[in-house]
């Protein structure tokens, strides 16, 4: 007869063994890939499918919830309804919850039966939503991996500076850029509003040299650039959008050097010793001019510059004479205090080692960019009491197609070796309280070199992801660079943003159309690097200016406005192939493009490649003459190649709208190469 106790005990042991075996086979979720890398992850088992409901526990988070819902729908095509009540399975919950260990930007996410995002501040919850969206876009239909995230940044300021003075950057791009920065938890965008090109490329005449001031100005009518500028209204709206996404905008008016836009407007302000790109600091009118200019954007109940900080410039002024150095220091101190009188924190380029002197310069609550140890030694500036922002030129400066600094940042080196504690040849202690954070910069030094906003973004995006990681996660990254670099490419730029023009995977056909009729609207705005666009054309006579395709950013011409050739226009530059569409002939054309060139193939054979083109300066001192002079010697007018612009002829191919052409276009095929 069986013993009931023994049977029960055996059943219990068997059940325990089964449970243990199951536990051995169960997988705890690994840390999700996010940029910047998550600080802490406690994995659990299983996945959570989202319900499509979003519960907000505080009215202060209403705006964050609306942004999350909008972004989620843009990325997935599914609605996220903001509702009240108790959470149900799969709901997303946003809540404010005090926690001193998380600071101002830290947050927690608990992915369990539902998904709860908590932080002490709205900014922290905003960053939590960015993490959630990144994880969700990689979920591949499995749901969100269960686990607990605890995350906060190593450094308070994580940013980027873009030079809009030498090249006009459309406000539409700046708005998208703010969204991209937010998606990667970059919280500071500095907009460099004025600057000038190199005089040597403009006939060595200051009056002809490119300059730009990119903001509407009532105080000085005519100061605003005519080749592209921002109205006050659109600049304010841009800042408001950035605020919604957790990004501070720092407007920069750079002076007392880099001021050619101001001295071309009012020549008497220019230095006679150091060139028109320098103010004459001994001229009282300089201070009246700058006081009034700053007041226009900082004064009033609703100032144009909305954020807590503004940048007063102060880089690269001459230190040739002691009296000039002292005057420069006086200027710097004056405008630190002047912008503070409007309630703003002053930010400036470090120059006080270069301009070492006796005139005191305010240091309390002043942010200084550490861009060059020769101009401002970080160790000395720390002793002085400045708050430091690491933006070392030898690591973090992009100057597109210039031949110096970086065309693309060395992201592998930055990922493996750099943090904001590394300020060039001087390295401070990691997380030193004097270090506010780190940034990188795009300087459009070579005005007129054909670089497009798309080219700038192609350089910016990988750098932004990497600098974001190193400012947030610091030395605590766990992935190799190869792993990180492969995975980061799978992430979107931001919800609803596709400045790179990515349409599909490599070596895939992403769009086909048997016949393209005049005025047709296509499903894609554009295709970015690397691509091939192929079509068959039965040519007809086309008027100059006849378009094939157009987007918001570019136009491809069947017959360009000047010569009637196949060509393209973007960013104010017109480039043409040495090819006219033959009337009454049928050919297959392919346009291939990458970040270095645009190539035309006719019937499968390369016709022409538009790559970087050197455009040389012709100067009398560069004239070549190797002949022995005599009465009957004729000397050719030829010049040694010396300084030149590397002119870029790239194209992100427009696709949105077909033009009004006479030719017949068939068999359109758009490929990712």
Name each model feature, range by range:
Residues 12, 16, 26-153, 346-355, ...:
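Acidic, contiguous N-terminal accessory segments
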Residues 101-278, 285-287, 291-309, 338, ...:
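Feature activates predominantly on carbohydrate-active enzymes
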Residues 189-191, 235-242, 533-535, 585-602, ...:
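Short tryptophan-centered beta-strand motifs in secreted/extracellular beta-sheet-rich domains
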Residues 262, 267-366, 371-380, 384:
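Active-site neighborhood of glycoside hydrolase catalytic domains
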Residues 360-366, 373-513:
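Flexible, acidic glycine-rich loops studded with aromatic residues
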Residues 508-569, 659-661, 665, 670-673:
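Extracellular glycan-recognition modules
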Residues 566-588:
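Short, aromatic/His-centered strand-loop micro-motif at the edge of beta-sheets
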Residues 609-665:
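Flexible glycan-contacting loops in extracellular carbohydrate-active proteins
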């Amino acid at each position: 007869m069986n013993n009931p106790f023994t049977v029960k005990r055996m059943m219990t042991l068997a059940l325990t063994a089964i449970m243990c075996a199951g536990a051995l086979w169960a997988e705890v979720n690994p840390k999700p890939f996010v940029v910047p890398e998550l600080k802490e992850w406690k994995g659990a088992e299983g996945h959570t499918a989202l319900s499509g409901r979003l519960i907000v526990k505080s009215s202060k988070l209403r705006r964050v919830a609306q942004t999350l819902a909008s972004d989620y729908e843009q990325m997935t095509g599914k609605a996220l309804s903001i509702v009240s009540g108790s959470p149900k399975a799969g709901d997303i919950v946003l809540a404010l919850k005090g926690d001193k260990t998380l600071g101002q930007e830290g947050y927690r996410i608990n992915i369990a039966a539902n998904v709860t995002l908590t932080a002490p501040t709205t900014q922290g919850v905003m960053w939590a939503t960015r993490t959630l969206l990144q994880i969700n876009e990689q979920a591949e239909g499995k749901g969100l991996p269960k686990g607990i995230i605890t995350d906060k940044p190593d450094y308070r300021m994580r940013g980027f500076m873009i030079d809009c003075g030498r090249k006009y950057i459309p406000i539409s791009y700046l708005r998208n850029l703010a969204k991209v920065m937010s998606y990667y938890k970059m919280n500071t965008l500095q907009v460099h509003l004025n600057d000038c090109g190199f005089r040597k490329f403009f006939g060595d005449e200051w009056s002809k040299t490119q300059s730009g001031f990119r903001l509407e100005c009532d105080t000085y009518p005519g100061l605003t650039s005519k080749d592209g500028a921002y109205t006050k209204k659109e600049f304010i709206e841009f800042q408001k959008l950035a605020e919604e996404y957790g990004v501070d905008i720092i407007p920069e008016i750079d002076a007392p050097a880099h001021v050619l836009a101001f001295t071309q407007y009012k020549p008497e302000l220019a230095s006679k010793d150091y060139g028109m790109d320098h103010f004459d600091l001994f001229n009282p009118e300089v201070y009246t001019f700058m006081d009034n200019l700053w007041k226009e954007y900082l004064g009033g109940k609703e100032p144009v510059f909305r954020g807590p900080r503004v940048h007063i410039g102060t880089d690269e002024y001459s230190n040739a004479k002691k009296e000039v150095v002292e005057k420069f220091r006086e200027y710097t101190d004056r405008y630190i205090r002047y912008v503070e009188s409007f309630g703003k924190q002053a930010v400036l380029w470090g120059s006080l080692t270069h301009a070492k002197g006796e005139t005191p310069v305010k240091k309390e609550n002043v942010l200084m960019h550490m861009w060059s140890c020769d101009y401002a030694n970080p160790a000395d500036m720390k002793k002085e009491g400045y708050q430091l922002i690491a933006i070392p030129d030898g690591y973090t400066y992009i100057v597109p197609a210039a031949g110096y600094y970086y065309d693309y940042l060395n992201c592998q080196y930055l990922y493996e070796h750099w943090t904001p504690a590394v300020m060039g040849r001087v390295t401070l202690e990691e997380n030193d309280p004097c270090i506010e954070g780190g940034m990188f910069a795009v300087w459009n030094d070579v005005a007129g070199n054909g670089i497009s906003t798309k080219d700038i973004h192609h350089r910016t995006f990988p750098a932004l992801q990497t600098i974001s990681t190193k400012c947030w996660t610091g030395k605590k990254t766990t992935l190799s660079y190869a792993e990180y670099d492969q995975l980061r490419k799978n992430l979107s730029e931001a919800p609803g943003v596709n400045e790179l023009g990515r349409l599909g995977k490599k070596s895939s056909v992403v769009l086909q159309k048997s016949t393209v009729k005049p005025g047709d609207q296509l499903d894609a705005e554009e295709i970015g690097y690397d691509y091939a666009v192929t079509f068959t054309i039965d040519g007809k006579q086309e008027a100059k200016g006849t378009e094939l395709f157009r987007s918001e950013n570019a136009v491809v011409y069947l017959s360009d406005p000047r010569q009637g050739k196949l060509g393209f226009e973007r960013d104010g530059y017109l480039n043409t192939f040495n090819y006219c569409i033959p009337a009454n002939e049928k050919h297959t054309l392919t346009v291939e493009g990458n970040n270095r060139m645009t190539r035309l193939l006719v019937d499968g054979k390369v016709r022409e490649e538009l790559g970087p083109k050197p455009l040389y300066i012709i100067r009398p001192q560069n004239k070549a003459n190797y002949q022995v002079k005599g009465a009957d010697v004729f000397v050719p007018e030829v010049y040694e190649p010396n300084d030149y612009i590397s002119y870029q002829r790239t194209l992100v191919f427009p696709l949105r709208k077909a033009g009004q052409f006479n030719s017949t276009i068939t068999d359109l095929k758009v490929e990712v190469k």
